[in-house]
């Protein structure tokens, strides 16, 4: 169907090619991203954004944001979404899903109307901020107003902002329902309803809220669902609330092709030493380190700074303004390392992240998939390293089976071609804050992580001390894979010799 629509639009081509070239020459586009990309985003049908015949003002925003050609999910989604048909789209993390629904949503907005014309729901506050920023960036020439609303911020401020025209409302379900129930957010003439990370939004935690929100929309609404995974509950929602949806499935495999995955077996009490070894050996542009609890996030962030590395942290118990500050600064390259809980597993797009470390191994395949998807964004290369203890060995095997992937034992030396770019300073941040200084995009690859000092923020989320060289070098035992007693990846804090016996759960140390 997407091919037929694109062909039909092609046959109705209007305008002069010379005049088209002139307006494109006047755009202030960022430097071209010269990094190689995988087939996750390059296996396209050869369409251009011009083939969708969207408003010129919208195309100006698209090109000025650094987009060059539509990715496969964008090629499939945009022409169908422009017809107003319901869409159920499944594609990998980091392949351009956000722009796939933002572009047709922006195209269908009437800026002369004061009514809210699109609601975009996301499961986390950070993702809401990012999505609203994408809307504002791509639609900056359209004269529309985009508002983001999430829990943890003042309700009265949102009520005041809704007194003005809001064309697109981006938010988390609970806060949007609160505003709609109070009659402050008028969704009665809102024809577009979008859910990003739909599998999370349709979990038992959110489903009742989602169904209440749908009742505020007109019956002839367009519903679009996007996610990397679709459990059975999504099918139930589709049958109940969607009309003959156009289904897109670009998931021939679950994991991104550009991400290399390794595991290292290490006792709990040796994890920090192992992390120090990884920091000293890897060439990190930016890294995200995941823990399974908020307490461990702060403890680990403190340990990392004691090793001499600059580090931010973020988790759900922090004040929202502090979380926002951490997220903003990390996206703009102020710090190299971020320790966090699963708060940032979904949808967060930070192009400069080339390493993800699971300090605590996740309990299920879905969480693992979303975590490692923070690297290797938009077809680029990335590295995922999992620190595995005795209790994680069965989860490791189960996740490999469910995802149809293989997590390799970590080698003594990791080939830099798998995750390192020659000039990380040139990595573009197409959806970034234009007011940020240009030096925030990264650091030369030859410079050791943490070699620059950063100012502390007055409030939580930022651990930063002076740089100190770590001297620990982890050793490796020898033995068959999956033999926990003699794992070839087992790190030892002293001489690299085997240690037998089950490791005991211990605090970060």
From Swiss-Prot:
ATP binds at residues 91-98. Residues 19-38 have a biased composition (Basic and acidic residues). It catalyses: ATP + H2O = ADP + phosphate + H(+). Keywords: ATP-binding, Cytoplasm, Helicase, Hydrolase, mRNA processing, mRNA transport, Nucleotide-binding, RNA-binding, Translation regulation, Transport. Residues 1-40, 422-509 are annotated as: Disordered. It is found in: Cytoplasm, P-body. Its EC number is 3.6.4.13. It comes from the Eukaryota. Signal peptide: none annotated. GO terms for biological process: mRNA processing; mRNA transport; regulation of translation. One of its GO terms (molecular function) is RNA helicase activity. Residues 258-418 form the Helicase C-terminal domain. One of its GO terms (cellular component) is P-body. Pfam families: DEAD (PF00270), Helicase_C (PF00271). Residues 7-16, 432-444, 490-503 have a biased composition (Polar residues). A motif (DEAD box) lies at residues 196-199. PROSITE patterns: DEAD_ATP_HELICASE, HELICASE_ATP_BIND_1, HELICASE_CTER, Q_MOTIF. SUPFAM superfamilies: P-loop containing nucleoside triphosphate hydrolases. Residues 78-248 form the Helicase ATP-binding domain. A motif (Q motif) lies at residues 47-75. Belongs to the DEAD box helicase family. DDX6/DHH1 subfamily. The Q motif is unique to and characteristic of the DEAD box family of RNA helicases and controls ATP binding and hydrolysis. ATP-dependent RNA helicase involved in mRNA turnover, and more specifically in mRNA decapping. Is involved in G1/S DNA-damage checkpoint recovery, probably through the regulation of the translational status of a subset of mRNAs. May also have a role in translation and mRNA nuclear export. This is ATP-dependent RNA helicase dhh1. It comes from Aspergillus terreus (strain NIH 2624 / FGSC A1156).
